[in-house]
């Protein structure tokens, strides 16, 4: 029973962490106060505001306080769904205005075509929202790559460091765990996916990166799927 689907992490795997940390995060932090003020009556944004109040256990938090909480979460790189949803909406404006394009490592761009030729399904799994992932890949340095993906997963699927998230992916794409390969740079994510029965490979693009006992590669050029 061979590999039929590959699931890739984004930050540090398909995309340079510096793009996330030095471009996307600061952009969302700077734009956040005005965005919330202008869009607080939007149903999706209003739902996110309510979710922030619930998570923070501050049901009566004002808009200014919610903004403060979200800015703190950005600073902490908190993987909270309402934050990731709002960031995705803010980044959508930035991409649309041409303020930046999505960084994708060239080796992954080249590999995508090969996966399609092999008949493999390709999915991404990120703590960033599905919307943010679609924006990243549709506004990439190499153009629109979204048609090369079969789907995307985010925190609504589960915490990337917990086994259940990967079991949920298995159920969603209707394959057995051993037919799925997960590639990530984060050891805890690989351990969780491995516990769920998936094949795993660690992407190590930086020599200072913490590694474990899993197979490692330095680029997608080195990933051979039979």
UniProtKB/Swiss-Prot annotation:
Q: How is the cofactor bound?
A: Binds 1 Mg(2+) ion per subunit.
Going by the UniProt record, its keywords in alphabetical order are: Amino-acid biosynthesis, Hydrolase, Magnesium, Metal-binding, Methionine biosynthesis
Reaction catalysed by this chain?
A: 5-methylsulfanyl-2,3-dioxopentyl phosphate + H2O = 1,2-dihydroxy-5-(methylsulfanyl)pent-1-en-3-one + phosphate
**Tell me, which GO biological process terms does this entry list?**
L-methionine salvage from methylthioadenosine
Listed EC numbers: 3.1.3.77
Supply the SUPFAM superfamilies for this chain. HAD-like
**Superkingdom of origin organism:** Bacteria
Which class of enzymes does this protein belong to?
hydrolase
Q: Which InterPro entries match?
A: Enolase-ppase_E1, HAD-like_sf, HAD-SF_hydro_IA, HAD_sf
Query: Which terms in the Gene Ontology molecular function aspect does this entry carry?
Result: 2,3-diketo-5-methylthiopentyl-1-phosphate enolase activity; 2-hydroxy-3-keto-5-methylthiopentenyl-1-phosphate phosphatase activity; acireductone synthase activity; magnesium ion binding
Instruction: Name the cofactor(s) required for activity, per the record.
Output: Mg(2+)
Which pathway does it take part in? Amino-acid biosynthesis; L-methionine biosynthesis via salvage pathway; L-methionine from S-methyl-5-thio-alpha-D-ribose 1-phosphate: step 3/6; Amino-acid biosynthesis; L-methionine biosynthesis via salvage pathway; L-methionine from S-methyl-5-thio-alpha-D-ribose 1-phosphate: step 4/6
Q: What family does this chain come from, according to its entry?
A: Belongs to the HAD-like hydrolase superfamily. MasA/MtnC family.
Assembly with partners or alone: Monomer.
Record's function text: Bifunctional enzyme that catalyzes the enolization of 2,3-diketo-5-methylthiopentyl-1-phosphate (DK-MTP-1-P) into the intermediate 2-hydroxy-3-keto-5-methylthiopentenyl-1-phosphate (HK-MTPenyl-1-P), which is then dephosphorylated to form the acireductone 1,2-dihydroxy-3-keto-5-methylthiopentene (DHK-MTPene).
Q: What is this protein called?
A: Enolase-phosphatase E1
Organism of derivation: Shewanella pealeana (strain ATCC 700345 / ANG-SQ1)
Q: Which gene produces this protein?
A: mtnC
